[in-house]
Amino acid sequence: MNKNPFIVCLMGPTASGKTDLAIALARKLPFEIISVDSAMVYRGLDIGTAKPNEEELQLTSHRLINICDPSFPYSAGQFYKDALSEIKTIEIRNRTPLLVGGTMLYFHILEQGFSDLPTADETVRKKIQEEAAQHGWAKIHERLNAIDPKSAARINPNDAQRIQRAFEIYETTGQPLSSYQSLKRFKALPYQFINLILAPENRSWLHQRIEKRFDQMLKNNFLEEVRQLYNRGDLNSDLPAIRTVGYRQVWKYLSGEYDYEMMRHKAIAATRQLAKRQLTWLRRWPDAKWFNSEDKDLISQVVDYLKGIGM
């Protein structure tokens, strides 16, 4: 019988309702929330990351939010160390860690450690090959440079095999190949992981929600938030914080590369692509219980499930 303590992981694509559900669960069960989000770690990235607001944070605190400046490239390895520290602190308080977010690589290294690069989806591989046949591998290399400049710098523009593999990693996981380079020393944590996946059954529901949420962000002064970052003078578009979906597109708008409508269109499209990559990874997740974002009795379903397995 497994005597290791529980960790509950609430995963899902962007805009699926994870934060609301997590706060509701933390008010009903002895949970303390740890954010598993590669963008929420940054101070000043609030509106565009859908970070919990002050009222929500007063109701239920979230660990690993607002812990570093956008000028600092926060890594998966640093997350592993920070998360382990927070998990131990919560254990001492006789509470259960509730890990919530959509950065799948972070969940992966906590639960499974890191031994090898993930395998690519055959559909993703075929798509890349078709694009290369149409535009050439040099063009694909240019695109790789935009999303993973470190890997692109190490790969010859004519090395089709390595370009394809680097692009497969990004398309499948949403993380650049270079982010995996320092992870081989990390081992899976000795806990019982309870994996909950929150996602809508209807893809159009998620697409509409993503569009509405981004438009609401714009109404909530998202442009001004990015402008403050832009005007600092010490940040640039190659930093992970500024490459975050939404921020990247508004940055290009502020620099004159996009007009307003193009910025909006590109941001919504990029967010939908992010959700698609997250779902691709989640469908392969072992031992996970799926819940439908659209269910009206979602909270009671999840609470009943957790109580049913002994929590």
From Swiss-Prot:
One of its GO terms (molecular function) is ATP binding. Its EC number is 2.5.1.75. Its cofactor is Mg(2+). Transmembrane segments: none annotated. The keyword Transcription regulation does not apply. Gene3D superfamilies: 1.10.20.140, P-loop containing nucleotide triphosphate hydrolases (3.40.50.300). Signal peptide: none annotated. PANTHER family: TRNA DIMETHYLALLYLTRANSFERASE (PTHR11088:SF60). Belongs to the IPP transferase family. This is tRNA dimethylallyltransferase.
